[in-house]
């Protein structure tokens, strides 16, 4: 709630946008605000709650360990002990998550599945960041990357650092051009990986 208060204060502080400022600029700015990391909030409520708030604020969904239902509404996030709800799966379909928000994932230790589908702000840096996070290197078992136009071979190859990855689906990624090289990289780095390619 406090976050939306801060955002509304910032919005109210805008008296007049320049004439050259179109709606794309405004929404880009707003998405950046939604992705901004509040380290005090992470400290106060824990990494899973803070990451849940970030993901839902940006239009993604989360599912917690021991639950079948996806959390889709920021205002209906469960309350209770901070260590009770651990993120097991993230579905970022059509969300506005971007690299500046990925520090929200630093403390996550139980994420097993990530789906990035039609994420227009996802770039190689996001996948590079995921591959650097020790906790996620251990926990992520499945990942799907679909219709993310800014992802290239460089970002996909960074996924080889997710050492327990068992399943990787890559579909409709126009920036990925060296399919055979990807296959070789993953066969070497993750021999037990099921790699499913639906690329042109």
From Swiss-Prot:
Residues 1-25 form a transit peptide. Keywords: ATP synthesis, CF(0), Hydrogen ion transport, Ion transport, Leucine-rich repeat, Magnesium, Membrane, Metal-binding, Mitochondrion, Mitochondrion inner membrane, Repeat, Transit peptide, Transport. It is found in: Mitochondrion; Mitochondrion inner membrane. One of its GO terms (cellular component) is proton-transporting ATP synthase complex. It comes from the Eukaryota. GO terms for biological process: ATP biosynthetic process; proton transmembrane transport. InterPro entries: LRR_dom_sf. LRR repeats lie at residues 62-87, 88-116, 117-141, 142-173. Mg(2+) binds at residues 59, 93. Gene3D superfamilies: Ribonuclease Inhibitor. Involved in regulation of mitochondrial membrane ATP synthase. Necessary for H(+) conduction of ATP synthase. Facilitates energy-driven catalysis of ATP synthesis by blocking a proton leak through an alternative proton exit pathway. Homotetramer. Associates with ATP synthase. This is ATP synthase subunit s, mitochondrial. It comes from Macaca fascicularis (Crab-eating macaque). The lineage of its organism: Eukaryota, Metazoa, Chordata, Craniata, Vertebrata.
